[in-house]
Amino acid sequence: MNIHRLLQNVKYTGNPGDFDTDFVTDDSRKVRAGCVFVRSKGGSFDGHTFAEKAVEIGAKLIVAERDTGVENQILVENSRQAYALMCGNLFDNPAKKLKMIGITGTNGKTTSAFLIKDLLQQMGKQVGLMGTVQNMIGSQIIPAKFTTPQPYELNALLSQMYKSGCEYAVMETSSQALAQNRLYGIKFDVGVFTNLTQDHLDYHKTMENYFDAKCLLFQNSEKIVVNYDDPYGKKVAERFKDKEVITFSDRDNTADYTARNIEYSSKNVKFLMVAKGSINRVDFPMPGEYSVHNAMGAALALIALGFDETDVCTALNHVHGVKGRCEILVKEPFTVICDYAHTDDGLKNVLSSIRPFVKGRFIVLFGCAGERDSAKRILMAHAVADYADYVFLTSDNPRGENPQSIIDSVSGYFDEKKVPYTAEVDRRKAINSALNMLQYNDTLILCGKGHEDYQVLNGITVYLDEHDIVKKFMDNYNKEN
């Protein structure tokens, strides 16, 4: 691609020259002969220190925010924004050829993304997906390294989707990705807001910064679907009142769509989705109060795209579950559930939904992530103590922190509340201990890992798949019983 085409819509000063290139990167480890290297700032490494080395390797052009001292450079105001635009140009801006749906929020992004993909496929559409669990092009599964990929990988994936015949792309958009301008230049047909609770404050520092990062999605969305029951959802609706905002609620009749006559069970939730001039019955095959919000948000994303309301609500009755999201691994003689809940709000949502249907003891296994927002740990303990009969305190991803210290930071709360617990640093051992404790009609929920099949311990990623652990236990259990 000619450099001037690569730089289309990028505002810069300097002379880029006139040459062709097939690669642009902001990763110093990927610099190669003939490429364009974008020097970005972030984290512990400043790409601005690497310019001379990149030219020695063979980079044709350096894109930077300040003078690097090398001859072949251009200067931009924001290198991350420039990089995102260049990556889009390199792949011929595939986002412009697709109907783009973005989902953001603390909880519910993954479930919402899979629901929207499922609903679109029921409408006969070819759909691509990017998210925490996996990326997908139709039925093809591509492993996901990030909730939202870096600009080069993101545009490469969107290009693959388009070339494979996809008409729609459904994306989870993380707050970090939005703040880092990974999605800069991409316009969304619909943006969906699920909720906002304390998370990622190690990165954003304040809830206001966290909220502002989420709102970057809606600045670039033509239509916005908002959970009006969330306080921050009301702020989204107010901030973007000049756009087409569609609100939903299970309690506020001022919302555009409300859920009424809600009936909960251990297997599903039934409700009427009511709007001005329409009533549609929904029999949604996933349990829990939060499932009402997930179902309505997904349905309204399609309705915002112009699909028939009745057709969409009918399709909601036939959607499939998502791996690691309130996923039932064992149904009898006891119940074992796997869920990704890793925030206090996520834990409260899933535990409060399951608790009413537990016939025996409710046993909760969870841990708190290391090197992440430590203030939320005690809030997670509060949520668990409110619902559990017995708790297994274990490790999540300790990373470089001492896992025992993480456990010790919350164990005192269970002592104070007189909630019995076992503390076990080794998550595999903790899971097996919890499984061996189960009696008839008990329910065990494994919280925090969900779809993940690994742990990060001291900077090393080790294999740990809770699905496999439970399967091996049940294979032995069934042989002996």
What are these model-derived regions, one by one?
Residues 70-71, 136-141, 198-203, 372, ...:
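A short acidic, helix-capping loop that chelates divalent metal ions and anchors anionic groups
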Residues 7-10, 83-224, 228, 232-244, ...:
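Phosphate-binding loop of NTP-binding sites
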Residues 1-12, 33-36, 42, 244, ...:
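ATP-dependent carboxylate-amine ligase
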Residues 59, 166, 221-222, 307, ...:
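A structural motif
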Residues 1-85, 89, 258-263, 281, ...:
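N-terminal leader/targeting and accessory segments in enzymes
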Residues 21, 33-34, 59, 70-71, ...:
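Short, well-ordered alpha-helix to beta-strand connector turns
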Residues 14, 64, 77, 131, ...:
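Short loop/edge segments at beta-strand edges and connector loops
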Residues 4-5, 64-70, 188-336, 411-420:
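Acidic, Mg2+-coordinating active-site environments of NTP-dependent enzymes
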